Amino acid sequence: MLTKLETLEQVYALCKDDPVRPHLPAEWRIRSGREVYALKENEDIVAVICVAYMDEVPKSERDMKWPGLDVAVFYTVWSYKKGAGRKIVLEVAKHIKKVHTNVKRFVTLSPLTEMAERFHLRNGATLLAK
């Protein structure tokens, strides 16, 4: 089940597990133009994803200062169960298409690792920059 995390306490409890951007504060992740979702199975959280809405595709984390409307940026995702990361990306994209009809593009701000690149390309992504 997909759940939007809306309180600072909910997000703070999970931020410490973020393998890519643990330095981003919980309050930054849920302020205007940003959302955090958890995927649950039997009340256990199996994956987490953080989304920022922008007007253009960011080239780096620094480019995500000001929120926008047209681009959903999945800037960090982590999972506690094999396959749950892919599942949460697909479910959140589907949810955003229904709720944020103005979003025209979905991108990830993934770290430059071979594993991340293979994962995204295998799942239909287009590499925009290296």
Task: Set out the residue ranges of the language-model regions.
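Acyl-donor binding region in acyl/amide transferases
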Residues: K59-A125
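Non-catalytic substrate-recognition and accessory regions of acyl/acetyltransferase enzymes
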Residues: M1-D70, V77-W78, T101-V107
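Conserved catalytic-core motifs of GNAT/GCN5-like acyltransferases
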Residues: T126-K130
